[in-house]
Amino acid sequence: MELLIAGKVLGSHNLKGEVKVISDLDNIEVLVGNKVILELADSQQKLLTIKKIEHLVANKWIFSFEEIKNKQDTIEIRNANIKVRRDIVGIGEDEYLVSDMIGFKVYDVKGDEYLGEITEIMDTAAHDIYVIESEEFETMIPDVDVFIKNIDFENRKMLVDTIEGMKESKVKK
């Protein structure tokens, strides 16, 4: 059973336990009535049933889960990835979503230098931007042919061609 990331919980929406979710799925409403896995920040997982989905704006949605009854219950699922079986949303084995690339290992074609893993994909007006993090650097690479040289879904790997200034030292928190 192969899972895909259907969305990410942004935070609570109201006192009734509904949450705001961002998703790049076109047919997200098919998830209503299905069980999904929420991958929590501490690497734990929670199995929940989607009761209702309402469109908010653009790629943002309001989700209601059977098991969540109030705002307090939404705290632990904030920033959780929502994972679902691929077949539920009609994604074939040879089809991919942008969110499937989260966790890909990224290498620079110059010297095959390891840059880190894709941790986020930002949707901008012009193109997506891949956020790549390692222990030392955070790199943002636009999804344009000049920089993206190869995407290998089978090995979960991306080859990029960076330019000076793309890698930034991480700020210690």
Swiss-Prot record:
Could you tell me one molecular function GO term of this UniProt entry? Answer: ribosome binding
The answer, when asked if Glycoprotein is one of the entry's keywords, is: no
User: Which Gene Ontology cellular component terms are annotated?
Assistant: cytosol; ribosome
Q: Where in the cell is it found?
A: Cytoplasm
Which residues belong to any copy of the PRC barrel domain? 93-166
Swiss-Prot/TrEMBL keywords? Chaperone, Cytoplasm, Ribosome biogenesis, rRNA processing
Cite the Gene3D superfamilies for this sequence: PRC-barrel domain, RimM
Asked whether the keyword Chaperone is assigned, the reply is yes
Q: What is its main location?
A: cytoplasm
Q: Extract the Pfam families matched here.
A: PRC_RimM, RimM
Q: Could you tell me which InterPro entries the record lists for this protein? A: PRC_barrel-like_sf, PRC_RimM, RimM, RimM_N, RimM_N_sf, Transl_B-barrel_sf
Q: Which GO terms describe its biological process?
A: maturation of SSU-rRNA
Protein's job = An accessory protein needed during the final step in the assembly of 30S ribosomal subunit, possibly for assembly of the head region. Essential for efficient processing of 16S rRNA. May be needed both before and after RbfA during the maturation of 16S rRNA. It has affinity for free ribosomal 30S subunits but not for 70S ribosomes.
Q: What is known of its domains?
A: The PRC barrel domain binds ribosomal protein uS19.
Subunit structure, per the record?
Binds ribosomal protein uS19.
| Entry similarity comment | Belongs to the RimM family.
Could you tell me what this protein is called? Answer: Ribosome maturation factor RimM
What species is this protein from? Fusobacterium nucleatum subsp. nucleatum (strain ATCC 25586 / DSM 15643 / BCRC 10681 / CIP 101130 / JCM 8532 / KCTC 2640 / LMG 13131 / VPI 4355)
